[in-house]
């Protein structure tokens, strides 16, 4: 594409391409907290200065799945500052926007909204950091989309089949088919490609007249047999692929000789890990497209914090370092000090004339101390550079290469993976879980749960703060195994049950689709549980709080009028009774007061424990419960089980006193001969101190306690 063609704006699309901005990364750090916001400001300023038609983002606009208010506020502030205005948009949308943006409440491009004044549209897919989660499957990009600042596209609504429908753009005689695919777990997407479940739809008319641009956010480098997306999986009619997620900047388009399309990897806009791939200079791209021709102009970012990295191997310097020398540690420190000073001098030299670049650089010196050397204290050494570098705590990284042993089986060298990360990537949580169980001894292997399910549950817990993910996965797989055993009618022998559990687990592992369904169902349960807890937490209104305060005040008045006794007894005589002759009720149930039609709901701190213990029984207990008929002995046993869970010696210290009302009831009832079931129920009454905290205690009960 010639220079004259590139400057012909009438028929030329000008697109600013960026990816992996990671807004909010280390926002609480005193030195690096504003780095991502400053870089986004520079990117948007470049877009406005070059008068681009639109901005194209390749995912991970946010670093956290639930960005902070500061991060969201700053992002909206910058988008409003640079992307709104009176400059007209020169291209039009030809495709059905209800299909392209069908998951949005406003299924049309933002610059065509009559209530908004957009001068630079932003099109973005979601990445693995800011992907949709929760019961409603929302992400931070949906907030920006609802506010009218970002056009979120490339979202797949199905986990079984993906149809990628392009956004069709036209400017003059140039037509672009913009395809997008937001981040999907690599193994799942790999399997869908293999099973031909991914389809890229093409325009029906004049297929060859469209420039096909595809934006994807997946692993490009190989992390495992299926934990990446090979370039050969993509359709060969594509002209250019914008590949997000990989942080090393390889923005110059490279040709895939097999598929004959070009791939541009813009890389991250900020340093998020001290790895070799991040040390490459950061750029964004100004993509010009006219007809079927393109040109990618690299634009360096001047506000990115400098990052210098160097490796040294102590064993390669036998003339300087001798592990038998008692002063070898001092020699190593002096050598490292010299290397770091050299990197700081290079940083100062490169920063000359660029006042927009942060003053303190990132420095990482990796030291291989193989060969009998010992590492020194990094914390003490780094004190010398606190005021000169942005990362003094991890300025030096010690590692060593272990000798390769004869492999008796498949083993994972974690030291090699950690000390030599591949091209700017880091290990993922689910990979570590899988690798751990692959190399673990037999006695610590999972026998009921699956490694893949546990890996994804841990990932949801760590990356997306789904606190119930692990618990719900365990419950779901346990329930499914219990149902399987009940349907098989196996004898209640431990050996046979273990064998059936092992066979059932192996069959599930072979059926990957079934395992996917299990994980999805467990994650859906966890998200629904979180949504319910959030709704219940916000259900109390001001009137509820006032009623709680009133109940507490009345209960406090009752306690003040009745002197407390020093009796520490438990069981009979403890808790609210509401008068003599009242029927006892088990904890967590309801009790009916004398001469009243009102039911008072009773609560206990231990009620949840009792219910949970009875519900989450073991496999053998669950199996036995279906084989035995209920009897009186079974009922008595159930009471003893609840007592065993609820009772604890610590309760005596928590509730050391009882009121005179309790003593009066106790003295009256002690003369009676109580049955075993009555004794079991007696321990379930709440103490008077629980009344102070119970906002649902009715007024009649409070009055009886006063009398």
From Swiss-Prot:
InterPro entries tied to this protein: Calcineurin-like_PHP_ApaH, Metallo-depent_PP-like, Mre11, Mre11_capping_dom, Mre11_DNA-bd, Mre11_N
Residue(s) of cross-link: Glycyl lysine isopeptide (Lys-Gly) (interchain with G-Cter in ubiquitin): 339, 480
Location in the cell: Nucleus; Chromosome; Chromosome, Telomere
Binding site for Mn(2+) 1: 20, 22, 60, 247
SUPFAM superfamilies referenced in this protein's UniProt entry, alphabetically: Metallo-dependent phosphatases
Compositional bias annotation for Basic residues: 569-579
Polar residues biased stretches: 598-617, 625-639, 697-707
Record: active site: 129
First-level EC class: hydrolase
Protein name as catalogued: Double-strand break repair protein MRE11
Membrane among keywords: no
Region (Interaction with NBN): 87-117
Similarity comment text for this entry: Belongs to the MRE11/RAD32 family.
Protein's job: Core component of the MRN complex, which plays a central role in double-strand break (DSB) repair, DNA recombination, maintenance of telomere integrity and meiosis. The MRN complex is involved in the repair of DNA double-strand breaks (DSBs) via homologous recombination (HR), an error-free mechanism which primarily occurs during S and G2 phases. The complex (1) mediates the end resection of damaged DNA, which generates proper single-stranded DNA, a key initial steps in HR, and is (2) required for the recruitment of other repair factors and efficient activation of ATM and ATR upon DNA damage.
Summary of subunit composition and partner proteins: Component of the MRN complex composed of two heterodimers RAD50 and MRE11 associated with a single NBN. The MRN complexes dimerize on DNA to form joined MRN-MRN oligomers required for DNA double-strand break repair. As part of the MRN complex, interacts with MCM9; the interaction recruits the complex to DNA repair sites. Component of the BASC complex, at least composed of BRCA1, MSH2, MSH6, MLH1, ATM, BLM, RAD50, MRE11 and NBN. Found in a complex with TERF2. Interacts with DCLRE1C/Artemis and DCLRE1B/Apollo. Interacts with ATF2. Interacts with EXD2. Interacts with MRNIP.
Molecular function in Gene Ontology: 3'-5' exonuclease activity; 3'-5'-DNA exonuclease activity; DNA endonuclease activity; manganese ion binding; single-stranded DNA endodeoxyribonuclease activity
Annotated NCBIfam families: mre11
